[in-house]
């Protein structure tokens, strides 16, 4: 459970995320989505009970353990004032084939022709030279190429058109090694069927 002074956010909350599973957390504004994300990311500690990671209390782990395995993609993606390539690779040594695969799976590959200098295009300060959708896709490509095993997306495709959102959704849902946690204020019934489990925040939740 978790409470702020004078306000209970979660009580008897029980969620189970298995390796390789695809999960959706759905709730309206004020349902506790942001608080839950901060708990999952280790930014908050539960007042009662615990967040377990590999069956161990998450609080015992070094924060780098999470950052090495987890990627958090939010609506307002942060980019460095450098090239598109550097924002994806973060200076890592990757082959052109690995970069292309990440670009295709993040629906960014076709946009290269729109960039003045392709991958070497300057993204600008915090990516201001790119659209919101392009920034989100760069964040997805970054997570994929760095082999992050847990991907948390907080409305992470909100700036994308339906076609590109579907490309990303398909690649992530079909990747068996990625544990996907999608956070959304709404999910259509036909979309829910694609997920291992859908948790509705604001309701009594159990595993």
Residue ranges of each PLM-predicted region?
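The feature captures the beta-strand-to-loop junction immediately N-terminal to the Walker
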Residues: 26-28
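Short beta-strand immediately N-terminal to the Walker A/P-loop
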Residues: 23-24, 72
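ABC ATPase nucleotide-binding domain helical subdomain, centered on the C-loop/LSGGQ "ABC signature"
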Residues: 50-52, 60, 85-125, 168-170
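Conserved beta1/A-loop at the N-terminus of ABC ATPase nucleotide-binding domains
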Residues: 1-6, 51
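Helix-to-loop junction immediately C-terminal to a conserved catalytic motif
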Residues: 41
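ABC-family ATPase nucleotide-binding domain "signature/switch" substructure
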Residues: 35, 71, 76, 84-87, ...
């Amino acid at each position: 459970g978790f409470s702020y002074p004078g306000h209970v956010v979660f009580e008897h909350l029980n969620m189970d995320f298995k390796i390789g599973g695809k999960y959706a957390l759905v709730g309206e504004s004020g349902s506790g989505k942001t608080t839950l994300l901060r708990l999952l990311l280790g930014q908050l500690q539960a007042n009662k009970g615990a967040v377990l990671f590999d069956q161990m209390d998450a609080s015992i782990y070094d924060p780098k353990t999470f950052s090495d395995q987890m990627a958090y993609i939010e609506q307002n993606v942060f980019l460095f004032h450098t090239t598109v390539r550097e924002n994806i690779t973060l200076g890592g040594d990757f082959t052109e084939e690995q970069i292309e695969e990440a670009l295709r799976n993040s629906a960014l590959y076709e946009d290269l022709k729109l960039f003045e200098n392709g991958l070497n295009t300057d993204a600008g300060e915090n990516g201001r030279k790119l659209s919101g959708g392009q920034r989100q896709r760069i964040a997805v490509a970054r997570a994929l190429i760095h082999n992050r095993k847990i991907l948390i997306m907080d409305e992470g495709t909100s700036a994308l058109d339906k076609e590109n959102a579907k490309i990303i959704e398909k690649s992530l849902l079909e990747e068996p090694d990625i544990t996907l946690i999608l956070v959304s204020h709404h999910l259509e019934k036909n979309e829910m069927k694609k997920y291992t489990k859908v948790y509705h925040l604001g309701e009594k939740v159990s595993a």
